[in-house]
Amino acid sequence: MLPSLEHGEIPRNLQRLLARSQSDEPAMLPRRSFLKLAGSVGLALGAFPHLAMAQAASAGGAASALKPTQQPLAFVQIAPSGEVTVTVNRLEFGQGVQTALPMILAEELDADWSQVRSRHGSNDAAYVDPLFGIHLTGGSHSVKNSFTQYRELGARARAMLLSAAAARWNVDVATLRTRAGVVLGPGGRTLSYGELAEAAMALPVPEKVTLKDPKDFRIIGTPTTRIDAHAKSSGRQDFGIDTRLPGQLTAVVAHPPVFGARLTTVDDSAARAIKGVKAVLRVPVDRGGEGVAVVAEGYWPARQGRDALKLQWNTTPVEKADSERLLAQYRELAARPGRRQFDADMAPLATAPRKLEAEFVFPYLAHAPMEPLNCTVQLSDGRAELWVGSQCPGLDGTAAARALGLKPEQVKIHVQMAGGGFGRRFASTSDYVVEACAIAKAARAAGMKAPIRTLWSREDDIRGGYYRPMHLHRARIGFDQQGKVLAWDHVIVGQSITSGTVFGEFQVKNGIDATATEGMRDPYPLPMRLTVHHPTPNVPVLWWRSVGSTHTAYVMETLLDEIARATRQDPVAYRMRLFGDKHPRHRAALQLAVDKSGYGKKKLPAGHAWGVAVHESFDSVVAYVVEASVKEGRPQLHRVTAGVHCNLVVNPRTVEAQVQGAAVMGLSMCLAGSAITLKDGVVEQSNFGDFTVARITDTPAFDVHIVPSADPPTGMGEPGLPPLAPAFANAIARLTGKPLRQLPFKLT
């Protein structure tokens, strides 16, 4: 996903570019007609975001200064029954945002939590990130950036309900209170939110509201079962892949075996003969390549049709990337001068009493979400509707409009629940969305008017590109007998994720992509010279859960542990000394993990060892103390104790789940077979049989502990991943005496 960003870091021209697809076409119903329509579908407060500004203006104009993102009418529906539906402006793909954001709004609304439901937003202008001004689910920003927004939305809706009750009873609004979805008035009078919602919607939206004192929170901070838990655990939850429209067809694409290859011959006679196949279409695919789409009545005939195709490809004009050759090239690059991010004096390196040299290799990694990529497109005259689990509906809407020859406002995106993403559903090229649009356009040109769902198989997904980049690190470190680092000369070689994309303007500085170096040096006060090279092999790359920290945290935390071992220091005490007094959150997280794990006090079984790592990413700090062993040459992780500092916690259960999920994904990086490799341009892996992800038998016991804080929330979707692998590696190194300098682990 996107690395951590601060408000204002996205330049205005990028905001304008991404915002072009926001559907802000007003549906100008008269207010009376709108009220009638809202009532007819059982909704009262906030049914249609396009109408929020127009309705507020017709009610007196008091909210004219408010942005669409500040209008409760776009985010809150209250049915006559009192059921509250909160529209979530982020993609839910397992991180729990469809519970966390409604909790925030419901807190200030003073709603009855048992009556709260949630739904996704769209590419409407109301649902952009309130700080960045674009549609965005990434960078662990969801709760962090929308915390104040959703509090104010809830407070505004509550104020409108109070005003409606005051008008009905003809009393001073100051005499009223709310509790769990009910307005309480003088003399024991009560009105439910459902009874007041229609009247409240007709009132001006207050610009200024008073928010609760955090000591009065009754929902925020409470361990809460996720809204979607029952639907998911019972198999009732619909995802993008489950989209079913009347007359819908399914398309499966034969992609080039080498990225960017083009077709020379197509024999589709056998495919067309398969029952259920409706069309075979040549379509453009990512990186200038060509593919063949088989459109059929369902997935199985489409898949059979694709398997029956006889295709020949021209791979001569495109580079055929090869993992072994790339590693050799990376090693050559590492020895050359390059761009500098840090440039400390390296003179002390020559005279340092102790020295350490190391090389680290990190492979390409596939995102491999449980739900493969899919997108359903329905075209009509001058309009398009898309159903897709999109991390950036604005970006995807712009790309879809361009592919279809439409204006951005003619494209409507229905954001669907997604079964994981980890950054894959946020490609700057919108590759699979553009592909689905190209197929729908070609099918319509061939006389087919049915909606078409384009569906990737697991093999398509793993071989389809957009990987975590392969990286090579080299370090030369000089330190003294007390472990004080005197000079640290470091080189990183790896592809840039953002160069040449719309994100490059604010991510690439002095030729260095910040996503490749985030997590280096900080928070440790190290005299470092950091040199960076960005080669450009023909392999599409993308952010992968926790982005650069997937490799930088491993390098930093294992090398520091190695220095501690070399100077016979406890790794916890060594880190605490490096933190000094400047990093209280790091100290608190690490100390909490140490205290809860029994580190240094509890006797471990024979053949077991402790491992420690701590890392900050996306403004949150996670420290791990792990217990590991080696059995028959195979590393085993037994227990993980986490200390987490993410400031104020909205839902402790979500934080715990995110830490566990991220840690398991970090564990996957360590396991044999968890690498994407290429041979003569072809990806060698295809499914979970040859691309390893952690199974339940690999998963350790978890104890997750959170440092109490009242400061505004920080991100938690990704920070649990980076420190897991180095903590595991440090434990194994203490057992074997040998550092592990590549992922996945290789002990021999």
Q: Model segments located where?
A:
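N-terminal secretory signal peptides
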Residues: 1-29
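Glycine-rich loop/linker segments at domain edges
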Residues: 2-8, 12, 125-146, 198-242, ...
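N-terminal secretory signal peptides and thylakoid transit peptides that target proteins
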Residues: 22-42
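N-terminal amphipathic, basic-rich helices that act as targeting or association modules
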Residues: 39, 154-159, 163-311, 627-628, ...
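Conserved beta-alpha junction segments in alpha/beta enzyme cores
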Residues: 57-100, 104, 237, 351-404, ...
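Short beta-strand elements
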Residues: 74-78, 237, 374-379, 472-481, ...
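Thiamine diphosphate
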Residues: 98-103, 398, 417, 421-447, ...
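C-terminal catalytic domains of large/alpha subunits in multi-subunit enzymes
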Residues: 106-137, 164-190, 273, 403-410, ...
